From Swiss-Prot:
This is DNA polymerase III PolC-type. Required for replicative DNA synthesis. This DNA polymerase also exhibits 3' to 5' exonuclease activity. Pfam families: DNA_pol3_a_NI, DNA_pol3_a_NII, DNA_pol3_alpha, DNA_pol3_finger, HHH_6, PHP, RNase_T, tRNA_anti-codon. InterPro entries: DNA_pol3_alpha_NTPase_dom (IPR011708), DNA_pol3_finger (IPR040982), DNA_PolC-like_N_II (IPR024754), DNA_PolC-type_N_I (IPR028112), DnaE2/DnaE/PolC (IPR004805), DNAPol_HHH (IPR029460), DnaQ (IPR006054), Exonuclease_RNaseT/DNA_pol3 (IPR013520). It is an enzyme of class 2 (transferase). Its EC number is 2.7.7.7. One of its GO terms (cellular component) is cytoplasm.
Length: 1437
């Protein structure tokens, strides 16, 4: 039943949130015209009476505000009763004028100075001058009258008059009244704001959790016409849909109303749905509408002008029950063939989803068997423990024979001088069992010459398929009426007699021949056989292809018509003659039985065709063997895919169950192509055989490898029979690649993204969802209920039961390497250094800190970790490179005393370098020991050293000191490879590996895949559907990699296979390091990882030291000149206008970005501790913006007092008087963005912690460690020192180490050119490319250098270095790699060639320096080569 006009209007009022307004309830919608092309909606409304102005304005505002983003809104109002026109007409005057569409500056005059009065049935407008009256001509008056009529008035006559006597009085009265009204509006607005704030505070408190089913608006009956989302293609006034919510969010608008936006799919498509809140009850319901619900929604479909997409505005929302798939079988099956999203670009669900589903269905166990990898094992183990289900750990491996035979039916007969029959068959398909030979051709050769030939067609007894005709060029007319197969085969036997038989990929042809002979009651071929395909692979392993036409072209043998048997045979014969001559000359092969002596050589595993097999670990020892096998496949036997030779599997088969896998397994392939006998031979290798539901094999029918479902059933039944014959269990498996049937599309998108490179794109993908026991029994019902139950339920459980319980792929604790005497060594290093700094008798605070840390470090077995770090740092320092510490290692005083970090975590203190006197400030008097004023030692008068950053040890190893230390070290990027290799020196190559990573499909990449799928399938998908499909494709493994710094150390009492398989990153067999196969995060708690990072700062420091001869460790941390750059650039001899920066920190690490420079401008730090604050504030999340920044601006606190680093919280709270454990718990919770833990806020208030501090803690999402900030600031100050006092040294180092992009022309031409280039980039704003933005940073430093009185010189062909900027007087000479488009390798080649001898000409430079003509032209244009002639000149004298 359709809605009445008034009911439609009430629906509209609900949408615009005015349903409760009584004065609007009598309205109705007379008409709505939608102009699709212009995106304009025109409403026609009717009311009983003219609406009061305030009601009308609110109605108009809400109407436009709600639908204005979808279309341009127009309207007209008609009223039944034209009552109170006089009152309303004057009220509406201002609105009428402003919305009349009249464009004139006199409009404001009409609003402010013209006073209307309704008199004698007309609106008299009294104005105070003739100009205004003249403006109100007939056209203007008619427009104003029409506007009145549009909002519900009848035709109104408007008469302008001039009233000089009363105009001013009336104007004054009007303005007084207007002031009163404005004051009332302000008061009302103020009350509204207070109400909104009160409402916000109430909403900030935890809203009561909604229980029960969601119901908003009217119920939606299941019998309603539920529309499938794919059928929604245009705007609709009202539709009902049902689906699954896959995304939901609630936004709070500026009006304080909430907007619910959620996305629903019914798996035919998806749509975005919106609804505005009307009251707090709505908001409570909004919080209950979350991802995972099934809902029915009724609403209108509208084109969203912002999203450019159809969306739904919801009227009613109703949660509904949705029946998930259930496994109702009494006896449950076990899935033994299951892929996760760790099967590269081939499966979509994480193992946790799959294990969870198996547990929900009551399955006793489930196996994980990804393609060639085990990377899902750690998560599978955790998921199994969580779900209480037995997890079997397996892999779908690529098995290969160690070598493929060259000769068959071996016989000791000479290869030279004999007769050869080279034959080829053309067939109707690939199966010797189900397809037929349609042409058999052969040539008989002797000494390389054809002496006879054989050529016969065979009538197969049925029409040829189009595929066969296209491939073989044989038609029905050619075979119709030919001899039968038996006749031709008998005739051929006479032809080949006692000859050696040859074929290219001969196993295929021999398979058809032998099957045919057996079919007709004759013997199989017994003659010696040679396969030229494997012979060619053995002799010429580096060729890229071995197809017959490829080899013929390579060796100059004619091939008249490929894929016609007689031509292929003759070509094969000539090739065989050449190959056998080569085999004799190179390997001494003279007899047939010698051919296979070399079949495992020349990486023969690469040429064997991989067949799939399932390997499942039966015992813990078997799991380790599985780790070894997968490692071999990735490291030793990788070729296109990881491969496992059968011989290697045989050696490590103990504890492993081997299954025959899918249609790519050799048992199924043999049964399909060669028959029962061949399949029987192969089946003996396996512990169980697999069969799969017919839908899984459907691509075989599509590819014409199997003719139809009947033949497919026959193959499956034969494999079941084969299992019975051999007493090998047959198990029904699902080849699972996703969880639910509707997830098929995600896999399709992944496969589509790989194009023709993936053979799965050649046919429709099969249905490979995770099947229930019921589904599986139904799939195999054609075998009968008893057989189906046996292979689906009984045998799958039998295999699962044979696997030991408790197998674990991950360890339960950390296994650190052993270094004899590590405990004593760390203690000795620490104590020796402490005594050297603080005296023979250590101060109590020093002794206690050392004792506390050493007890924890030694007691928990962490000494070796410290010692490794100490040795690395010591070696780097010895080799001339400083090391910076990252993270929280600077929180450990033992790390400081053992030389791992420069950061001293003790409270700020003085210490005397001569007599070791010390004095500590333990109550927060100073933020850093580097800020202590200069002071002489009271004992000996020596100037004392300030030190100590006041960092608690707990931030490093936890409150109990038992957290595994994570020591991150910043080595110079130049030195990092040396540091990595030093780990191999310390522990041995077999005990050190790079930390492996797994690269998965990211959101943006998935979006690209979906868009490509949309294009390739010629579809138009809504944005919500694209988002859903992208979500389904994210998280899937794409590749592997390595952590840029992580080195994993295997203890010498174990081997790597106790923790993880190994591989090369991204399967790059040329990589220098092997990595762990498992992502390092999954074994982080089991094996020690050292983060040996590469960083520019230590490289920069080394370069500055080399150029200046100054030891960076002697640079003061409180130099006044250096401190000035953080407040302004004047100390550099420039002002802010010259360098376009209000600070002098351009190019200073940590302090050179626009964001941090802005912080410096607001705070003007003058001390080390304040710089620490800046570093912490700039790296944290919600620590500065909206937090500390506001507190400082408001004058509540200073920079020194705000919360800057995470450690500040613990120390601040201790200084306020809280106990250390409470302080630690608060710090840990706040730094992770969890706010103040429940119950601790009262403790803080009891300790008189200020409100601002408590509120600040509540805003923080992430915090930076103070030790990390300390190390960074120390490096920054050292670099800044050179910038202030050794500018050319600084700039030479900066441009050499930190800069990658240059505009050498602008730089060399001087200030004006450089500033113009900078302006060009700045003018682009956000449109500037990343490269341009990086260049701008470099140009800012270049500009600063020029403004300080220095200059750049263009590349000098005689002086320039390959990559280093050279100082010459007050200039820097640019290196060759500053040339646009010239890489470092070419730059080095130029320098090397120049060192050999000077360049004689541009031609000489181009040849010996390998310089392109483009670069030659560039250098010529910029006078770099002005001294060189174009070509070498020959001198006779």
């Amino acid at each position: 039943m359709s809605l009445s006009e008034n009911e439609q209007f009430r629906v509209l009022l609900e949408q615009i949130d005015l349903l409760d307004n009584a004065e609007l309830k009598d309205g109705s919608i007379k008409d709505l015209t939608v102009h699709s092309n212009s995106k304009r909606w025109t409403f026609s409304f009717e009311f009983n009476d003219i609406l009061p102005l305030q009601i009308f304005v609110e109605f108009h505002h809400q109407l436009v505000n709600t639908f204005g983003s979808i279309a341009q809104i127009d309207f007209s109002i008609d009223t039944i009763n034209k009552n109170n026109v006089a009152t309303h007409a004057t009220d509406y005057w201002d609105w009428i004028i402003k919305n009349s569409g009249i464009q004139s500056s006199l409009l404001q005059v009409l609003c402010d100075k013209s006073i209307p009065e309704f008199k004698d049935g007309q609106l008299v407008v009294k104005v105070d001058n003739q100009i205004t009256k003249n403006f109100l001509n007939d056209d203007v008056l008619q427009t104003l009258s029409n506007t009145y009529q549009k909002v519900g008035f009848g035709p109104i006559k408007i008469k302008p008059t001039i009233d000089d006597n009363t105009a001013q009085e009336r104007l004054q009265a009007y303005h007084e009244e207007k002031i009163k009204r404005d004051q009332a509006i302000v008061q009302k607005a103020t009350e509204a704001i207070k109400k909104a704030e009160s409402k916000k505070k109430a909403s900030d408190k935890a809203m009561p959790e909604f229980n029960g089913k969601v119901q908003m608006g009217k119920p939606i009956n299941g019998k309603d016409n539920i529309v499938q989302l794919r059928d929604i293609t245009q705007e609709e006034r009202s539709v009902s849909i049902e689906g699954y919510i896959f995304d939901a969010e609630v936004k709070t608008l500026r009006s304080e109303r909430q907007l619910l936006i959620f996305k629903v799919t019914d798996y035919t498509s998806s749509i975005t749905i919106k609804k505005f809140s009307r009251n707090e009850a709505d908001e409570q319901l909004f919080s209950a509408i979350k991802k995972g619900l099934w809902v029915r929604v009724r609403g209108s479909i509208q084109e969203d002008s912002f999203m450019k997409d159809l969306t739904m505005n919801a009227y009613d929302i109703m949660e509904v029950d949705h029946a998930d798939r259930q496994d109702t079988a009494t006896d449950k099956r076990v899935e033994l063939h299951l892929h996760t999203n760790m099967s590269t670009m081939d499966a979509t669900n994480g193992i946790s989803d799959l294990v969870g589903q198996a547990a929900k269905w009551g399955h006793p166990a489930v196996a994980v068997t990804d393609h060639a990898g085990l990377q899902a094992f750690p998560e599978a183990h955790a998921a199994g423990k969580k779900s209480g289900i037995k997890t079997l750990f397996g892999v779908e491996a690529n098995l290969v024979d160690d070598g493929v035979p060259i000769g068959y039916n071996s016989e000791h007969c000479p290869l030279k001088g004999g007769k050869y029959v080279i034959f080829d068959v053309e067939t109707t398909g690939l199966s010797a069992i189900y397809d037929k030979v349609i042409e058999l051709s052969a040539v008989k050769m002797e000494n390389g010459n054809v002496i006879d030939q054989f050529e016969e067609f065979i009538d197969p007894g049925f029409p040829l398929s189009e595929t066969t005709i296209n491939l073989t060029s044989i038609t029905d007319e050619m075979v119709r009426g030919s001899m039968s197969e038996k006749e031709v085969f008998t005739k051929f036997r006479e032809f080949y007699e006692d000859a050696i038989i040859v074929g290219h990929n001969v196993t295929f042809d021999i398979g058809f021949m032998n099957t045919g002979y057996l079919r007709h009651g004759m013997e199989e071929i017994k003659n010696p056989i040679i396969d030229t395909l494997t012979l060619a692979r053995f002799l010429y392993p580096t060729l890229k292809g071995y197809r017959l036409n490829t080899l013929a072209k390579k060796f100059g043998v004619a091939l008249e018509h490929h894929h016609r048997a007689i031509y292929d045979s003759e070509t094969t014969g000539h090739l065989c003659y050449l190959f056998l001559k080569d085999a004799e000359e190179r390997y001494g092969i003279e007899y047939h039985d010698q051919l296979n002596d070399h079949m495992t050589e020349n990486e023969a595993y690469k040429h064997a065709r991989p067949s799939h097999a399932i390997l499942i670990a039966k015992t813990q020892a078997g799991l380790k063997n599985l780790f070894k096998l997968v490692s071999m496949s990735n490291v030793k036997y990788y070729y296109r895919v990881p491969r496992i030779p059968r011989s290697e599997l045989e050696k490590l088969r103990e504890g492993i169950i081997v299954g025959s896998a899918c249609s790519s397994g050799d048992v199924f392939t043999a049964m399909m192509q060669k028959g029962y006998a061949d399949a029987r031979r192969k089946a003996k290798f396996y512990d169980y055989l697999e069969v799969m539901p017919k839908p899984v094999y459907q691509p075989l029918i599509e590819q014409e490898l199997v003719s139809d479902n009947k033949k497919l059933e026959e193959i499956i039944a034969n494999i079941v029979k084969l299992g019975e014959d051999l007493d090998i269990p047959v198990v029904a498996t699902g080849d699972v690649h996703y969880l639910n049937p509707q997830d098929y599309i995600y896999r399709k998108i992944l496969i589509n993204s790989q194009g023709g490179a993936n053979p799965l794109n050649r046919s429709e993908l099969p249905d490979v969802h995770f099947r229930t026991t019921d589904e599986m029994l139904e799939d195999f019902s054609f075998l009968g209920p008893e057989v189906a139950h046996k292979i689906v339920v009984e045998n799958s459980n039998k295999i699962a039961d044979s696997v030991d319980d408790g197998i674990s792929p991950v360890k339960d604790k950390l296994y650190t390497p052993k270094m004899p005497g590590a405990e004593d060594r760390i203690k000795q290093l620490s104590m020796d250094r402490a005594h050297a700094l603080y005296g023979e008798v250590l101060p109590e605070i020093v002794q206690e800190r050392l004792d506390k840390e050493l007890t924890s470090i030694i007691g928990n077995g962490f000494s070796v970790i410290y010692l490794i770090a100490q040795r690395l740092v010591h070696k780097s320092n010895k080799d001339g490179y400083l090391v910076g510490s990252r993270g929280s290692v600077g929180s450990s005083f033992v790390a400081t005393m053992s030389g791992i970090t420069e950061v001293n975590p003790l409270p700020p203190h003085y210490r005397c370098p001569k007599c070791q006197y010390s004095f500590f400030y333990t109550k927060g008097e100073y933020g850093s020991g580097y800020d202590l004023p200069d002071k002489e030692c009271p004992e000996c008068g020596t100037w004392m050293i300030g030190d100590g950053q006041d960092i608690p040890f707990e931030t490093f190893l936890g409150f109990k000191g038992d957290k595994v230390p994570d020591i991150d070290l910043n080595f110079s990027g130049d030195y990092q490879p040396i540091a990595h290799n030093y780990m191999q020196v310390l522990f041995g190559k077999d005990n050190v590996f790079r930390a492996g990573t797994i690269g998965t499909v990211a959101d943006k990449t998935a979006f690209g895949y979906v868009k490509a799928y949309e294009r390739d399938t010629n579809q138009h998908l809504r944005g919500a559907e694209i988002e859903r499909l992208a979500k389904g494709a994210t998280g899937v493994k794409r590749t592997t990699g390595q952590h840029p710094a992580g080195i994993l150390i295997v203890p010498d009492y174990m081997d790597v296979y106790d923790f993880s398989p190994i591989q090369y990153p991204a399967d790059d067999q040329t990589a220098a390091w092997e990595t762990t196969h498992f992502d390092f995060h999954s074994i982080h708690d089991n094996i020690l990882k050292m983060d040996i990072l590469g960083h520019d700062d230590p490289t920069m420091i080394r370069k500055l030291q080399d150029l200046s001869g100054i030891d960076p460790e002697t640079i003061p941390t409180d130099d006044p000149g250096v401190m000035k750059i953080f407040s302004g650039p004047e100390v550099l001899g420039v002002d802010e206008n010259q360098i376009q920066s209000k600070t002098g920190t351009l190019g200073i690490p940590e302090f050179g970005t626009r964001f941090v420079r802005g912080m410096l401008e607001e705070t003007h730090p003058t001390s080390y501790s304040e710089l620490l604050q800046i570093s912490g504030l700039s790296h944290g999340t919600d620590v500065w913006l909206g937090n500390a920044e506001e507190l400082i601006k408001a004058g509540t606190v200073t920079l020194k007092e705000v919360i800057g680093c995470r450690d500040n919280i613990m120390m601040d709270l201790i200084h306020y008087g809280l106990d250390s454990q409470s302080s630690f718990q608060i710090m840990e919770s706040v730094r992770k963005g969890k706010g103040i833990p429940e119950g601790y806020e009262d403790k803080m208030r009891a300790a008189n912690v200020p409100d601002w501090y408590i509120e600040s803690c509540g805003k923080i999402k992430y915090m930076f460690p103070r030790a990390h900030a300390s190390a960074y600031v120390l490096m920054a100050l050292r670099i800044a020192y050179f910038k202030v006092y050794y500018p050319l040294v600084y700039y030479a180092a900066y441009f050499t180490v930190r800069a990658d992009d240059f505009d050498i022309v602008s730089m060399a031409r001087g200030k004006e050119s450089l500033k113009n280039r900078m302006q060009e980039i700045n003018d682009k704003g956000n449109d500037a490319s990343t490269k341009e933005k990086n260049l701008l940073t470099v140009l800012e430093l270049a500009n600063e250098m020029l403004e300080r009185g220095f200059e750049f010189k263009m590349i000098d062909i005689e002086k320039s270095d390959a990559e280093e900027w050279l100082i010459e007087g007050k200039s820097l000479i640019a290196p060759f790699n500053a040339l646009p488009g010239l890489g470092l390798n070419v730059a080095k080649q130029i320098v090397a060639a120049r060192a050999d001898k000077p360049f004689l000409s541009k031609e000489d430079l181009s040849k010996r320096g390998h310089v392109s003509q483009t670069l030659i032209d560039f250098m010529t244009e910029n006078n770099v080569l002005s001294e060189l002639p174009d070509e070498n000149q020959l001198s006779l004298f």
